[in-house]
Amino acid sequence: MPLLNEYIRQLLPEMTQWRRDLHHYAESGWVEFRTASKVAEQLHQLGYDLTLGRDAVDADSRMGLPDEITLANAFQRAREQGAPEPWLSAFEGGFTGIVATLDTGRPGPTLAFRVDMDALDLNEDTDGHHRPFREDFASCNPGMMHACGHDGHTAIGLGLAHVLKQYADRLHGVIKLIFQPAEEGTRGARAMVAAGVVDDVDYFTAIHIGTGVPAGTVVCGSDNFMATTKFDALFTGVAAHAGGKPEDGRNALLAAAQAAIALHAIAPHSAGASRVNVGVMQAGTGRNVVPSGALLKVETRGETEDINRYVFERAREVIHGAAAMYGASVELRLMGAATSSAPSPGWVHYLREQAARVPGVEQAIDRIAAPAGSEDATLMMARVQQHNGLASYMVFGTELSAGHHNEQFDFDENVMAIAVETLALTALNFPWQRGV
């Protein structure tokens, strides 16, 4: 059997090919039909037990789900783009989650590794300096691009699946590989948590590449994610002739505008950082019509769950107050959510020990003082910890061609080998008799 590092280096060209295929056929949240089908096919061929679709994703817990027409069109596109049929049907309707399980048959705990699969709603750059365009693997799906590295994450998950099967005789306990849909907008993890996919997990690790961490650095316990609530506010008023009978109208546009201004005046919290943002406002049908409908797309964030809850509750008060001022009604619809991150110190220490063994890792650290957004893997972390398990979130530094969520985003694909080796060592070196 080859040495682990040698085997992974031999696997890297294939991982790169997988990554570039996924990049070319980018699919955004809840429509990762081709992506999930390709992943499931390969995991099945490796001999993993698979939990798919509705068994891995709770229907009622999905957030920010596209409409039925969008889902149907994306499903048909995936079929036309080569999604393997035996697997494609399992994901129809927006149930694009996968859990691959390797039961060694030997005593030991359950370890889980989570990667995300979705792309962003973004048009990829077509400049000749952009490597994916230059080398002909830029996204062929309009308005969808892997601009955050999730194509790399998925390839890392598949690479890890290959390695664990190759070295299965050295493993103990149960290994679960979680391929999550719809991380962007923090929409997908809650539905997989509700389906119970991490309820039996003793040790949990989620990963990301890049995020401003320099190449050669591995962060083993990222703890700077903010709790967040993402929601739509739908205002309903009464349409009327703006010149003839304006008093008969109830102006939903003005209610939404009042709310948008007032939301940004919510007082900060003394216990830590908070954020609120109105990213979209849509209203009106014509200049001579009192608008009867309006939409705000809003998000709140907090350094802790309590701070985010404070901001969200104040936001709800502001929105309902603005609606009342103009005689309108308003409905709030939850579109995404995540909690703050609190990695388990003992697990972070163990992960740091494994990362430090990997060639190409110059420093393995517990945390890094840098601002972060939000990440719904924190919901999986929290559930594992609620069940007395340990959890953490790792970031593998790499050189980026542009920042995350930018149309020129790309990364150094060598980071995938570093990530796979670190995660493989995490399973292979686990002290199963005493735990961490």
From Swiss-Prot:
InterPro entries, A to Z: AbgA (IPR033845), Amidohydrolase (IPR017439), Bact_exopeptidase_dim_dom (IPR036264), Peptidase_M20 (IPR002933), Peptidase_M20/M20A_hydrolases (IPR052030), Peptidase_M20_dimer (IPR011650)
Keyword list, A-Z: Hydrolase
Biophysicochemical property: pH dependence: Optimum pH is 8-8.5.
EC numbers for this chain: 3.5.1.134
Single biological process term from Gene Ontology: folic acid catabolic process
Protein function: Hydrolyzes indole-3-acetyl-aspartate (IAA-Asp) to indole-3-acetic acid (IAA). Shows an exclusively high substrate specificity for IAA-Asp.
Any GO CC annotation of this UniProt entry: cytoplasm
Similarity comment text for this entry: Belongs to the peptidase M20 family.
First-level EC class: hydrolase
Keyword Hydrolase: yes
Quaternary organization: Monomer.
Record's keyword annotation contains DNA-binding: no
UniProt xrefs under NCBIfam families: amidohydrolases (TIGR01891)
Organism: Enterobacter agglomerans
Organism domain of life: Bacteria
Protein name: Indole-3-acetyl-aspartic acid hydrolase
GO MF entries: dipeptidase activity; para-aminobenzoyl-glutamate hydrolase activity
Catalytic activity annotation: (indol-3-yl)acetyl-L-aspartate + H2O = (indol-3-yl)acetate + L-aspartate
